[in-house]
Amino acid sequence: MDHAATMRRMYDLLNAGDVDGFGDELADDFVDHEELPGLAPTKEGVKTFFRMYIAAFPDLRMDAEDILTSGDKVVARSRATGTHQGEFMGMPATGKAVDVQLIDIIRFGDDGLAYEHWGVFDTMTMMQQLGAVPEGPPA
């Protein structure tokens, strides 16, 4: 199976706002090891998160810049962009653009579905871009 193609398809589905289609790529017993504040680390929890995220950033784009595969795992170094147009995690819309880097690691099963996810998202940069956290001094 071409797990890299599945990873790209998952991003494409999110870019199209198709959270249910994205969810179809997840196994029923999917586990997310990346903390989603206030949400269960399950298939339904992840779908809820992306519904909230897309409501807040309706022009969300997730683009894989590099994809590496090894056995049943895929690693994507990606970029998420969008404009904050709705409430997100208690923060009212700011109208500001975000451009954030992230890493996704997915373990796929023999059936081609995603069973586990580990991720790192540059939340600090996003909060600085939204004006919720002051930017630090230049490096």
Where are these regions (language model features)?
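C-terminal and inter-domain tail/linker signature
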Residues: 1-139
